[in-house]
Amino acid sequence: MKKFLSLTVLGVSLVSLAACGNSSSKTETKGSLDNEASKVLTVKHGNVRQNFDKIIMANASQEFSGGLNLDSLKGLVCEPTSTSHEQAGDATLDVYNWQYDNVVVTAKLFNNSTVVKSISTFSYVRDSKITLKMYEDLKNGTSYDNAVKTLGVPDVYSIAVSSDATMTQALWSSNLVTKKGKTGSLTLNFKNGTLENKSQENLINK
């Protein structure tokens, strides 16, 4: 199934989170940047964010099998709020959305196997630690795991599996050092787990 899923099927934009900041009600849990990746932070809809991490993706080398099926998704995030269909090349994807206040989880399935997942408009509450220098020090080729060790877990992210590559877009918004009165964002795009490009808004050094 050649290129049945184009990279544009990442679909749900994460950019909208950049302006959301700390708008929703949350309970703050503080921790060092080094251990944030393994800490459970207590935030509004934090359980949704945790369950989103558990959504297993399809394997492109096995005809896109192995991804979480709809029944398993319902077990993690309940009944979908809405459903639709989407063409991706020669394939038809089943698209499911779950909405929790402003937080939206999307899963796109091919043959009942998850090939795209995304979460938007979610943010943690944590100390502002990511500086412009930390951003500048991130080089193309950096692994996703190493980026998380440096920055902490992203607030939101999306993954799309295609016959070409597995693409991950991750966005940080809650732990940034930014210009006074400004909302910032840091976005990293990974191809097969390695950093391909990056962008930021309003980051500064302490």
Stretches with model-predicted labels:
Residues 1-4:
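Positively charged n-region of N-terminal signal peptides that target proteins for export
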Residues 6-14:
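Hydrophobic helical h-region of N-terminal Sec-dependent signal peptides
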Residues 15-19:
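C-terminal motif of bacterial Sec signal peptides marking the signal peptidase cleavage site
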Residues 21-23:
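Bacterial signal peptide processing site
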Residues 29-45, 66-112, 143-206:
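A cross-family detector of function-defining hotspots
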Residues 46-51, 112-137, 201-206:
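Intrinsically disordered, low-complexity Ser/Thr-rich linker and spacer segments
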Residues 55-64, 130-138:
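Second-shell loop/turn segments in exported
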